[in-house]
Amino acid sequence: MSIYKNHIAIIGAGISGLMLGIILKKHNIPCVIFEKYNTVSEYGAGISISPNGLKILEELNLLNKLKMVSANPYKTNFYSNSSMITSIPVDVVTTSRQSLYKVLLDEYLSLQGDILFDHELIDINLSKKTLSFLNNIN
């Protein structure tokens, strides 16, 4: 795997791994994602992304793509005994994990990002600067 000798290794192709990969690729920093499973996960629950997360998505030009496949509530209502007692504005995007994952995966792949599947990490050798995987590919 000497073609990745000078790349930053990202362990895991989840939301965080893809986000890091996108940031690195957009800054022209070579990276590769190693994923222990043989495919991406399609499972997950609904999530709400708060302003700090939205800011990062905006900086990466991904917020509008995510909003197109998400709910964008503008307020939250509070009720007591079936009567609304107050309403406050909210700045969140509510989406499914799958929708967020697809936006991130599509972006990472469009940046020519590599994901190596079936690569379960079993060891990091800091002195040799090598990774070892369960599939014996180093």
Give each language-model segment a name:
Residues 11, 23-45:
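Glycine-rich FAD pyrophosphate-binding loop
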Residues 17-18:
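N-terminal Rossmann-fold NAD(P) dinucleotide-binding loop
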Residues 14:
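Glycine-rich NAD(P) Rossmann-fold beta1-alpha1 loop
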